[in-house]
Amino acid sequence: MTSVIKRDGRNVPFDEGKIEIAVSKAMAETQKGIEEDVAALVAKAAKDNFTDKESVTIEEIQDFVELELMKHSPEAAKKYILYREERTKLREEGWQMSDLQKDIYNNKYRYDGESFEEFIRRVSGGDDFIGKAIKDKKFMPAGRILAGRGLDKFGKKITLSNCYVMPQVEDNIESIFDTAKYLARTYSYGGGCGLTISKLRPKGAHVRNAANTTTGAVSFMDLFSLTTSLIGMRGRRGALMLNMDVSHPDIEDFIDVKNNLEKVTSANISVNINDEFIKAVKDGTDYTLHFQVESTGEVIEKTIDARALWHKLAKNNWNMAEPGVLFWDRINSWHIMSEDKNFSYAGVNPCAEEPLPAFGSCNLSSINLSEFVKDPFTDYARFDFEAFEKMASAGVIYLNVILDENTNLHPLPEQRKMSDDLRQIGLGIMGLADMFIKLGITYGSESSIKLIHQIGRSLINSALRQSALLAKEDGPFPMYDAEAVLASPFIQANADEDVLELIKEHGLRNSQLLTIAPTGSISTLLGCSNGVEPIFQISYTRKTESIHSEDRYYKVYTGIVKELMDKMEIYEEEDLPDYVITTSTLNYKDRIEVQAAWQQYIDASISSTVNVPNEFTIEDVEGLYMYAYDMGLKGVTIYRDGCARGGILITDNKKSSADKIQELQKEIDEIASTELKQNPDVCPMCGGKMIHSGGCAECTSCGYSPCSV
């Protein structure tokens, strides 16, 4: 016998050692324990029994092992039979899930006790190809689709869009409170929101009311943050991103606002950086902050040292992991609609992967790259481009169907109109780090960057091609301007010749196609790495709590690492191959270069967190952000291990949660311990530990994520 036919039809080499391992596991459950000679005898008997056959099914081997084991250890045979029955049941019911994955599935996405098959049918809409892709963990819609698709039939008002952007707040009291109302309504349907506050006049500007002067743009951030914290979204809080242009006179107060843990507790914040400011930083010159009050003509200006403001921004990121930076001119210049004079972005969504116009929204789904590796963990492992391109095309079709279904599920009429006019979708990827490990490629190496370019170009052209074919059938999106789209530098740089001809002939059905979301919850559900991120760590420590005895801590390996160790029969971390690297061992420049390679092919943006070590300096942060700008990123966030914001994930040789909280109390304004529950690094649902990755955060205990993508 030379090969074994797996249940999915794949032929794999026969491995006698795997039979020994399976038998040993069954024997370990008996009173006698493992008898290595018996395990070896059973494995050899299986090999000898099928000598004359070129290939044999996995079921035939297991049936034989069952009978052979009965001769040597009936008790072990019984355990083996029970194990097979349990695995069969799991295959029939769905994925094999950890407790955390079950919590995510049951509490976030499963509706009213539906079976796994019912869940698949509901989410796929009965599309067999999509349903199988989800089952095979090759494709996963975003959280709002998983949670809400089909529930309108039961009278539920749940949007299928993960994210929205509001119009910029106008400089008057009516607009400020209308915006709070828009936020509340959108949160009640399950959508997260982005909001730019750059049109609000700065502190000290004159107003025509009893106050005489305004408290400034920053003072209204807490109103929007409070609205976000009050409106629930099916067991989770709302999600909000607040932005301010770097040229606003209140920018220094904006950068500092999160130094007080009582301020803006329910929002992410980012600074919109323009090219002019970057040039001033590089040249070491002054930069003018400018605001003109539209209603009165009053001009407020302030000249600052550009490098001093850049340093303040870096220092706050070093200390508090916020604000993030958005390179706004690049965001505006690198997308399908960049040359359309009637189109403009108003802000970004809560995790910053989606720049959107006023009242814009986006439906999201992601392709799991790691499941497109053929013969993983072998010398002949390779990426299946044909299957990937087929999946990408199907993903575009799927998201267009979702977009149509969602028309009447948007919270606001303006959102419905914008969705119909622009037809923006967001197909992305996850499982990048897992894919590299399966291929034996080091994340950030030249080989990895080369492969990203190949996959990225394949992805954008598959998406453009399918969108053009949909336009052939149903017409281009209503705001389509052929001259502007064809003049887009993004289209000119990325569209293959045949795809460009299709666009010229039929137009595009969608004004936006690709994005890379943090995929925190859905990647955890599938058990793969999130977004474009490297794996966070090789292993982590889990705690089992006991009422009657001391709590116990035990080591759990990250999914892909455990899979590699099992396949390659590795028993110690020290023996892992060099290409298994984590956020703590990866050079930040390599991490930036990976994201830069992807950004070339992504017309929206990429949600990203660069995790850096504790010893990373403020000057290092400045260098990282400038390198990100120079490499062509649209935005980036950092998270420094041990920063004052308080990452309290317990790993080997780390301080306890109590110690971290105690330090946090001392470091930031002596805030009372009762207020620490609002710390973004402590889960607001269960008090567990939050991991920062992919431009978002996720609880390691209950799976809560403010992004829920």
What is the predicted function of each stretch?
Residues 10-11, 32-136, 141:
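Core nucleic-acid recognition elements
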Residues 67, 93, 140, 144, ...:
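Core structural elements
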Residues 74, 79-93, 273, 333, ...:
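Terminal amphipathic helices with adjacent charged low-complexity linkers/tails
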Residues 161-385, 408-417, 463, 467-472, ...:
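Active-site cavity-forming subdomains of large catalytic enzyme subunits
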Residues 180, 292, 391-416, 420, ...:
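Internal maturation/activation junctions in enzymes
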Residues 346, 351-355, 399, 403-406, ...:
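Catalytic alpha/beta core of large soluble enzyme barrels
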Residues 683-686, 699-702:
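Short cysteine-rich clusters marking metal-coordination/redox-active sites
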Residues 703-709:
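Short Cys/His-rich micro-motifs in 6-15 aa windows
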